[in-house]
Regions:
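A charged, well-structured terminal subsegment
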Residues: 147-164
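Short hydrophobic segments within beta-strands
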Residues: 34-36
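Non-catalytic signal-transmission and effector/linker regions of two-component phosphorelay proteins
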Residues: 17-31, 163
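Cofactor-cradling patches in redox/metallo enzymes
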Residues: 40, 47-57, 61-152
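Cationic, low-complexity basic patches in intrinsically disordered or flexible, solvent-exposed regions
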Residues: 14
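Aromatic (phenylalanine/tyrosine) cluster motif
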Residues: 2-3
Length: 164
């Protein structure tokens, strides 16, 4: 048992070292991102960590907190002239939530606003594909975290949202 734990510990240290070597992407343009946790979702720890890392890259973040409706988020993104929306959804209902967000942005003529999301393992791979095929910019999965690390995911989000 000790050997197994020490191997896992070594692997975790290697992963941390790899993640530390990722240089934060610095945007070329002014980038504004609205962050929130979805309606009926009180799990805001992940989005709070992510927003702080996003802010550290020089991006302006408008954070709405948890338990936010699609209309609240979309209206804020439009009013604040945001480049993107970054959401977490750990409570289920994410397919309807993200699709409604996309549809509402289209309806309001805000097609330039990109939508990013994540929900740990709650959003299944086939649902991620369905949402991205629908028009959601990116849904991050646990494998993305393992492959890219947190800073790598933030870099991807900020770089994709970095447009004039």
């Amino acid at each position: 048992m000790f050997f197994k734990n020490s191997v896992n510990c070594t692997r975790k240290k290697q992963d941390l070292l790899r993640m530390e070597q990722i240089t934060p992407y610095k945007p070329l343009h002014k980038v504004r991102i609205v962050t929130a946790a979805s309606l009926f979702d009180g799990h805001d720890a992940a989005i709070n960590i992510m927003r702080r890392i996003i802010q550290s890259t020089g991006v302006e973040v408008i954070h709405l907190g948890h338990d936010r409706s699609v209309e609240e988020v979309v209206n804020c993104a439009i009013q604040e002239d945001a480049n993107a929306i970054a959401m977490t959804s750990y409570q289920g209902g994410h397919n309807e939530y993200f699709k409604y967000m996309y549809d509402l942005l289209q309806e309001k003529g805000a097609t330039h606003i990109k939508i990013f999301g994540g929900g740990g393992g709650v959003i299944l791979p086939e649902e991620i594909k369905e949402l991205m095929d629908y028009g959601i910019t990116r849904i991050y999965a646990p494998d993305d975290g393992r492959e890219l690390g947190l800073q790598g995911m933030i870099n991807d989000l900020v770089k994709t949202a970095d447009f004039a």
